[in-house]
Every structure is written in C-alpha cells, then in structure tokens.
From Swiss-Prot:
HAMAP family for the chain: Ribosomal_uL23_B (MF_01369_B)
Gene transcribed to yield this protein: rplW
Cellular component per GO, a single term: ribonucleoprotein complex
Subunit field text: Part of the 50S ribosomal subunit. Contacts protein L29, and trigger factor when it is bound to the ribosome.
Protein name according to UniProt: Large ribosomal subunit protein uL23
Length: 101
C-alpha cells in the first residue's frame, strides 16, 4: 500500500499542449507532469484516489531539458517526467469544473 502523503507528491500538474488535448479527445487519455522518481503503480494509485476514476493504463517518458541562451550565458532547463494516463471507457476528469458554459 502506497502512503497517502506520497500519492499527493506524485502528480505535479496536468500538461496542457496541442498534442495532449488531441489525445484527450480521441483516446480518453490525460497527460500529467509527475515526479521524476514516480513509478507507474504510484501514478495509477494517485490518479484513482485524487480524481475518483478508474485507470486502464499508464505510459511514462522522461523529457530532457533543453539548453537555452540568456544573453551571453548558457543555461539548461530541468529534466522532467510525463505520464499518459488512459482512463476506462466512460470515465472523465473535468479540470475546469463547468466554467465553459
């Protein structure tokens, strides 16, 4: 059993992009930014507990931070982890709460 305080630290934010919106509409999949040390089992448990939905599958990938230039200095953005969470048919997560009326 995964501790509740760990589950609250696993999910950081939903990742909103053109691709994530398209995947959400077609495949009933939600994209999250997650902790870099999070496992698929932890991500599944966190989504099911926090949003009260059933998760069918979880796919993860590590996003490598890009090197960026600021004036004459070179910097690097942080690496982060992305999770594609596929929900069971008929399940849905509403982030805006009916604001688009």
């Amino acid at each position: 059993m995964i501790r509740e305080e760990r589950l609250l630290k696993v999910l950081k934010a939903p990742h909103i992009s053109e691709k994530s919106t398209m995947v959400a509409e077609k495949l009933n999949t939600i994209v999250f930014k997650v902790a870099t040390d999070a496992t698929k089992a932890e991500i599944k448990a966190a989504v099911e507990k926090l949003f009260e939905v059933k998760v069918e599958a979880v796919r993860t990938l590590n996003v490598v931070g890009k090197t960026k230039r600021t004036g004459s200095r070179m910097g690097r953005r942080s690496d982060w982890k992305k999770a594609y969470v596929t929900l069971v048919e008929g399940q849905d997560i509403d982030f805006v709460g009916g604001a688009a009326e």
